[in-house]
Amino acid sequence: MIKNRKEDLPIVILKENVLFPNITLWVTFDNEYVINSIAQSMLEERLILFAYSNEPNCDESDRGVVKNLCSVGTYSKLIQVIKISKDVIKVLVECQSRVLIDSVSKKNDYLRAKVTFVPDSSGLNRELFTYSKFLKETYEAYRNSLSLKSYDADNEPINYFENPSKLVDIIASNSNLENSIKLELLQELNVKTRIEKLIVNLSIEIDLLDLKKDINSKVRAKLDKGQRDYFLSEQVKEIQKRLGKDENDYIDRLNSKDIPEDVKSKIEKEISRLSKMQMNSPDANIIRSYIELILDLPWNENTVMKNHLSEIEFILRNSHYGMDEAKEKIINFLAVYQINSKVKAPILCLVGPPGIGKTSLVESIARSLSREFVKISLGGLRDEAEIRGHRRTYVGSLPGVFISAMKRSGKSNPVILLDEIDKINSSYKGNPESALLEVLDPEQNYKFIDHYLEIPYDLSNVLFVTTANSLNGMSKPLLDRMEIIKVEGYSYIEKLEIAKIFLIPSIIKESFLDKVYIRIEDDVIFNLIRNYTMESGVRGLKRVLTNLIRRLVRELLYEYSKDQIIKGNFYSPSSLIHGNNSLFTHDPDIPGIYKIININNYYNYVDTEDNLDLIKIDSSGFVYGLAWTNYGGTVLPVEATKFEKKGDIILTGSLGAIMKESAQLAYSIVKTYSSKLNFDVKESPEIHLHFPEGATPKDGPSAGITIATAIASILSDKKVPLDLAMTGEVTLKGFVLPVGGIKEKVLAAYRNGISKVILPKDNKKDYSKLPEEVKDNIDVKFVSSLEEVFDYLNII
């Protein structure tokens, strides 16, 4: 070591440990100043000084701490740093030598010190050899007094017998001496004096340990059997007292909650049972979990409605586009709720195709009411115990989804979404739909009993909202408990507005393009809606727009750096406003990054258009029908051909029983027009009807007039216009009956470029609810009989 060598390095002040040179060990730190010093050391050469204060209650942030530092510190090197948590680190330290602290200064949020290295004699002369030998013997006696049979092989004192300085440091580090004594040994620079002090202190410790052993042996010898029993009894009481800490906590929590008296009495009995059990008993763990669940549940802890009715209405109407009927029913209920807070909430069921925002609407409802929101997915649920919970006698039993949801919400009046209630399945484990009847009945759910709880729990303050794609197959008792709100798909204009107001801004924000000026023209969005998505909702549109923005990001990264895109102040927010013909308009005088996507360049950012065009066959016997599915409306082509031989009707295309009956019925009706269609009923030709997309099951009565028209068209050899579609059920006498799903069906026709639609006359009221945009672009013919259809198409 170079004599009088000096260095400037970060400093850490230790309060509880004394680190001796020649030792490698792990040290844990949780102090901000210490962590900052270690971080600075890692940025330099990993060297650091461990210093010690004469005042045990010193604080690194105290300016006067410098004056109280010991003159000698430990010069060390950081080998490894592990982050345990946000404010805790674990450091592997190699302590190397003693140094004298010349000065300490504060740098921002850590301390630095200037130090001078002091030579530490490691030579072995006869005198030091004798001292070292005596120290080793004293240390062996000290270990025997502690009943230590082995110690760390790496720090074995005998390994450093020829280096007295290392020997004394390692023995001092391995001993249980007080920190004040260890600090005195660290400060001592003379090796001989250091050994003398350590021998004296170890000898004192040996005497104290031997005296303690002697006293204990004499006391134990005097304890008779009765005294030993009393001693053991007191130990058991102390253990039980310590274990009873949980019991006291449970009692305090129980008294702090507004729990019904019968429930409180039951829990007190469970707590009493728990206190008499062994801590690790399986039954004790079951009871403990049960008690904690009861205490974690909200009991009469309601969220107060903070917003006024007008504010709630504003939030609902501005946070979600469309679904006016659902919003109206919620607002009507809240109007009554503000007058009478004990009114029972309705059970709403939003029915509609996927991707139209049913789930996000429920989230908006919870937000407007300032209530907690919890979602329960019921799709694929087939075990009744998932609803009612498992009885506690079963291993691994758990409460049902509703009790778990209440625990997660932490409030007694959350908004709970029951998603995809139509996809619940029955199994040998029971019918979950039957279990839902109690939950969704306002007359019963105030005392809902979960099998795990075994006590009534009040769900009457919960606002339940369910969603479904279809009501087909759902039990009538369950439907009877809910207010059904049918939510239809969106028109082009509605999708355009949703894209401009919600989708594009959210995608831009998620892509960190807030500081980039992006304009996507309306023509581009319209083209994406028409040619890339044929859906009732907007999920497909969001995917297309997301892919467009991603390609835009890739293009930007070729031209600009990441920091320019994310952090650059490219425009003033006031320069962006909503325009009529584009998403945003921009002041050209403001500098920045511009990306304008118009009808001429948008194809650079999207995939090749999918072939979504309808099948078009310009011949007689080909007609478009309109159908409703769980995913919205669709256009259903129907093909008919005839054979000269006499026969009946042949049906293909994966048809259900109702649709097959409709086809038989339609052919019978058409036969009544045999004279006008120029064929002999007695020689009725064989007709083959085919419905394309044969892998897709089709059923329902609404294709009646479509099938009849296709048969009449092939028999009369007259074509039906390819820009026309129809829907309606027919009777044996030729009357046209109303059908459901009019909005979805007409929207499907509009999406597919159909300009004329034939509808039952009794569906006028449904047609009137369609957006003006759709009604302005489609000509509708309302009919009450099949003859009107044939006359309109000039078939007869």
Swiss-Prot record:
One of its GO terms (molecular function) is serine-type endopeptidase activity. It comes from the Bacteria. One of its GO terms (cellular component) is cytoplasm. The keyword ATP-binding applies. It is found in: Cytoplasm. Its EC number is 3.4.21.53. Residues 617-796 form the Lon proteolytic domain. It is an enzyme of class 3 (hydrolase). ATP binds at G352, P353, P354, G355, I356, G357, K358, T359. Homohexamer. Organized in a ring with a central cavity. NCBIfam families: lon. This is Lon protease 2. It comes from Borreliella burgdorferi (strain ATCC 35210 / DSM 4680 / CIP 102532 / B31).
